[in-house]
């Protein structure tokens, strides 16, 4: 996921401040995920794992999901094409998938926020971390479609503006 993020950042980074902020937030989320999946159970029963690391991941997770749903998705659509966009079919397909994905991810958040992970629950927790990794990967693929669409639209608009300016001169 980090490699795909790096590749996407190289392709579209710098094309729009909103996209750059979104990609930066994704990187922070991925770093916290990588940190949390490295957590191992302690030797003593009922000794919690690094709760701060899990708390940080859950916090980043909610922040990332919230900014996408309540800020970024709508702004991208409005800035790029407007409400009457012919590409609204793309967003009409992606948005429900993102909504379902959010429910999956929030179920993890609700289950593992403020809980102690001990040896008895460690296997379940490790499986949940694997599942959340798959859910994040699926989400990022959907979001990448929006990002690519936005980058292409902004580039086309810049080319059209450049053509207009060259025709005036």
Swiss-Prot record:
Entry coiled-coil feature ranges: none
Gene3D superfamilies, alphabetized: Regulator of RNA polymerase sigma(70) subunit, domain 4
GO annotation, biological process: regulation of DNA-templated transcription
Pfam families documented for this protein: Rsd_AlgQ
Keyword set, alphabetical order: Cytoplasm, Transcription, Transcription regulation
GO cellular component labels: cytoplasm
Function: Binds RpoD and negatively regulates RpoD-mediated transcription activation by preventing the interaction between the primary sigma factor RpoD with the catalytic core of the RNA polymerase and with promoter DNA. May be involved in replacement of the RNA polymerase sigma subunit from RpoD to RpoS during the transition from exponential growth to the stationary phase.
Protein name per the record: Regulator of sigma D
